[in-house]
A protein has these predicted regions:
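"…together with the soluble PPM/PP2C metallo-phosphatase catalytic core" -> "…together
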Residues: 1-217
Length: 220
């Protein structure tokens, strides 16, 4: 647990400093958020730094890698050892990366074409759904139970609907930050609320494995 907390702290610092450097670089290159001409009341948001999600994803990888490296073993002292990687957690990281790529393309098109509209909404939603379908199919191939748990010890069989719910969850969580981000142009605020909620859920499950041994974010 201590290793995870330390890795999370280092990941946070990495995002903090890399974002600061990135924002300075983007400003020097005049890379910022374009504004729709008809929305004059949004003029104050013009030039807001964009593509900041890149640093969040990189920071996530830093934290993930550090949390899977053991630098100290009691009785053995300093010794670098690689901890086995949970394939489900790694897949979540890959899902986040692909969603990040979709967001990067969206921001890149905005900057490239100097307009507020990057990817069309239907194209973005389609790409996100494709990623969700791939993830859902993977978990389906692992022969997980189709039982949908409302809380520990209570659930009901929903059959194939569960895999549709997984797609809905993945796309929904992605857009809960993405759409809110568009209100002020900064992802940090909305992401903090979203990540904070996921952190609390994850910590609770970690502290109560006897109740949630058969559950994970994917199972829910």
């Amino acid at each position: 647990m201590i290793a995870v907390i330390v890795a999370g702290g280092i990941s946070f610092l990495f995002v903090l400093f890399s974002t600061s450097i990135g924002v300075s670089y983007f400003k020097s290159k005049n890379i910022g958020q374009p504004i729709q001409e008809e929305l004059n009341f949004h003029d104050h948001k013009k030039g807001t730094p964009t593509m900041g999600g890149v640093f969040i994803i990189l920071g996530t990888y830093v934290g993930f890698i550090l949390s899977h490296i053991n630098f100290w073993t009691i009785g053995k002292g300093f010794k670098v050892e690689l901890i086995s990687i949970n394939t489900e957690i790694f897949l979540l990281l890959i899902i986040g990366t692909f969603m990040g790529i979709v967001g990067f393309v969206d921001d890149y098109l905005k900057v490239k074409k100097n307009r507020n509209l990057g990817l069309k909404a239907r194209n973005k939603l389609f790409l996100q759904t494709v990623v969700g379908c791939i993830a859902s199919y993977y978990f389906f191939s692992l022969d997980y139970s189709p039982t949908f748990y409302l809380f520990s010890g209570f659930g009901f069989d929903v059959g194939f609907i569960k895999w549709i719910l997984i797609i809905f969850l993945i796309v929904g969580i992605t857009n809960s930050v993405n759409l809110t981000d568009g209100l002020d142009g900064l992802v940090a605020g909305s992401a903090t609320v979203s990540f904070g909620g996921i952190l609390i859920i994850s910590f609770w499950i970690f502290r109560h494995p006897e109740y949630y041994s058969s559950l994970s974010l994917i199972h829910i």
